[in-house]
């Protein structure tokens, strides 16, 4: 079969929910992917910020193979050792107290919403509470996650969504204050907006929201699904600001390719929120994903991944700034660490598609931002190679 045969086969069998690039990936190694024709691609997308250690990492692979040979799934009717080890590591890294493992980031958001609502229900003795989310945010595509996603394009066909969700403007504290009332139980936002165009929270905003939450007994939920797990130079992006959420979500690089997410909370929230029967999952937190999360966090801590990101990220920023200065149609770079975006005057889909011809994988964030979320193991030479390949098609 040739590449087109694979594409035609997929198009005839899979539900058409993605506008895929005409690329059939066969395997990967390090920071490179290879298609079924053997062509090499430098990957600066990392499976949308998932493959923190790149591809075909032997230590990670061996850990998963060993767990497959023991047991992959047992259900949550019983305890298992790998998920206990994973829980201890993620709680240490996040400074949180309790964790629930899910199968995806979207599921983590659903759990966080339920935990916030149950907390308020336990406190007040009644339901009907509200959540404040942000315009231009993205939290997932299930009904609950979609309800707090601030983009009408995604929401409109599926309305009515969850009631009681109001939208403020990201980094506008006054717009948040204006929406708070005695029904507000939570404020949710991404510490660094991804799909919304790579905007990070200002220090004044995130500290201001934390203060409002403390004043009104509102829970602060921070979505760290894309920006967490070392990507910004701290294990979680909120750790740059000296504030702490009441609930946070994680996924993507948490499993480095294995489908896993998590929502974490403080002991104060855990004591008043989800109890037996309130939430559950069949697959979530099974021994296989536990082994993956445990190994990922072990490697990140041992190999000082956040320190490496702090070292290489300024070089990526410098080279992207030079690119913006060189081309009139590129107007701005923004981001934190190895989560960067370059703004273009026109839609960037054509640039991402054209980059594939040069053996480079980059993706978009919204319609006019080119997104760079490479594996966290990249070196300066990889940045140079990326710039060279990108400039060849600009």
Locate the predicted segments by residue.
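Conserved N-terminal phosphate-binding loop of PLP-dependent enzymes in the Aspartate aminotransferase
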Residues: 1-394
């Amino acid at each position: 079969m040739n590449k087109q045969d694979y594409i035609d086969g997929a198009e005839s069998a899979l539900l058409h929910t993605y506008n895929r690039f005409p690329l059939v990936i066969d395997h990967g190694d390090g920071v490179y992917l290879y298609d079924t024709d053997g062509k090499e691609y430098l990957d600066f997308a990392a499976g949308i910020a998932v493959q923190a250690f790149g591809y075909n990492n032997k230590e990670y692979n061996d850990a998963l193979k060993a767990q497959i040979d023991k047991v992959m799934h047992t259900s949550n009717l019983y305890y298992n050792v790998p998920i206990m080890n994973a829980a201890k590591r993620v709680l240490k890294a996040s400074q949180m107290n309790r964790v629930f493992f899910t199968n995806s980031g979207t599921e983590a958001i659903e759990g966080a919403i339920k935990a916030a609502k149950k907390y308020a229900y336990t406190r007040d003795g009644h339901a009907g509470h509200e959540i404040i989310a942000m315009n231009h945010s993205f939290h997932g595509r299930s009904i609950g996650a979609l309800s707090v996603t601030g983009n009408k394009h995604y929401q409109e066909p599926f309305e009515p969504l969850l009631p009681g969700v109001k939208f403020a403007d990201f980094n506008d504290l006054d717009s948040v204050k204006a929406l708070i009332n005695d029904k507000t139980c939570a404020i949710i936002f991404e510490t660094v907006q991804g799909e919304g165009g790579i905007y990070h929270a200002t220090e004044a905003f995130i500290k201001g929201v934390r203060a409002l939450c403390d004043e009104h007994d509102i829970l602060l939920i921070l979505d760290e699904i894309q920006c967490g797990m070392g990507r910004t130079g701290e294990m979680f992006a909120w750790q740059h600001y000296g504030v702490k959420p009441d609930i946070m979500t994680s996924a993507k690089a948490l499993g480095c390719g294995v489908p896993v997410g998590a929502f974490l909370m403080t002991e104060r929230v855990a004591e008043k929120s989800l109890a037996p029967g309130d939430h559950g999952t069949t697959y979530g937190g099974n021994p296989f994903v536990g082994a993956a999360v445990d190994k990922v966090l072990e490697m990140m801590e041992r190999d000082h991944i956040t320190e490496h990101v702090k070292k290489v990220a300024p070089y990526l920023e410098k080279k992207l700034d030079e690119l913006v200065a060189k081309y009139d149609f590129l107007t701005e770079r923004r981001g934190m660490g190895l989560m960067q975006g370059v703004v273009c005057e026109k839609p960037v889909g054509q640039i991402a598609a054209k980059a594939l011809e040069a053996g480079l994988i980059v993706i978009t964030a919204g319609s006019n931002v080119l997104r760079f979320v490479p594996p966290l193991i990249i070196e300066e030479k990889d940045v140079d190679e990326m710039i060279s390949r990108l400039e060849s098609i600009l």
